[in-house]
Amino acid sequence: MSIVTKSIVNADAEARYLSPGELDRIKAFVTSGESRLRIAETLTGSRERIIKSAGDALFQKRPDVVSPGGNAYGEEMTATCLRDMDYYLRLITYGVVAGDVTPIEEIGLVGVREMYKSLGTPVDAVAQAVREMKAVATGMMSGDDAAEAGAYFDYVIGAME
């Protein structure tokens, strides 16, 4: 839930106007909109490069994943791994645009650790894949944008650990 919606819901539940603090938070959210959209455009427009570079780095650091018996062994399974990376990058983009981790949590992280464990997927490798995407993506951004985007990558990584 965005800060705008959350503030309105809270104020309405108490039958009151928005407080000065709530208005300040909404103003900050609106003011940061341009940078959040710029970050989302960078992530979206560079997604193929981010996924490919991060995938290459992951497979170099974790050769066990693409070796016989590994979860990304073979063309089909490697493609599945890259598809999952794309999925997490998309979720991160949603969070950036919303200015909140709620879309990430509600759309994609509920029960993810348990699902990966049941499939025999090494969760630490998934977390490493997100770390690699963070490194590539934030390397394409200014310091402030990288810090903003990095927080959403870190949220996903934390959910995997």
UniProtKB/Swiss-Prot annotation:
- Describe its PTM? Contains one covalently linked phycocyanobilin chromophore. The chromophore on position 81 is added by the phycocyanobilin lyase CpcUS.
The membrane topology noted for this protein in its Swiss-Prot or TrEMBL record is: Peripheral membrane protein
Q: Where does (2R,3E)-phycocyanobilin bind?
A: C81
Keyword Transport assigned to the entry: answer is yes
Presence of keyword ATP-binding: no
Where does the record say this protein resides? Answer: Cellular thylakoid membrane
Which Pfam families does this chain map to?
Answer: Phycobilisome
Alphabetically ordered keywords of this record = Antenna complex, Bile pigment, Chromophore, Electron transport, Membrane, Photosynthesis, Phycobilisome, Thylakoid, Transport
Top-level lineage group: Bacteria
Q: What is its main location?
A: membrane
Gene3D superfamilies from the xrefs? Phycocyanins
- In the UniProt record, the signal sequence range is none
User: Which terms in the GO cellular component ontology are assigned?
Assistant: phycobilisome; plasma membrane-derived thylakoid membrane
Question: GO terms for biological process?
Answer: photosynthesis
Belongs to which family?
Answer: Belongs to the phycobiliprotein family.
Its subunit composition reads:
Heterodimer of an alpha and a beta chain.
- Function according to Swiss-Prot or TrEMBL: Light-harvesting photosynthetic bile pigment-protein from the phycobiliprotein complex. Allophycocyanin has a maximum absorption at approximately 650 nanometers.
- What name goes with this protein? Allophycocyanin alpha subunit
What organism is the protein native to? Picosynechococcus sp. (strain ATCC 27264 / PCC 7002 / PR-6)
Q: Quote the gene name from the UniProt entry.
A: apcA
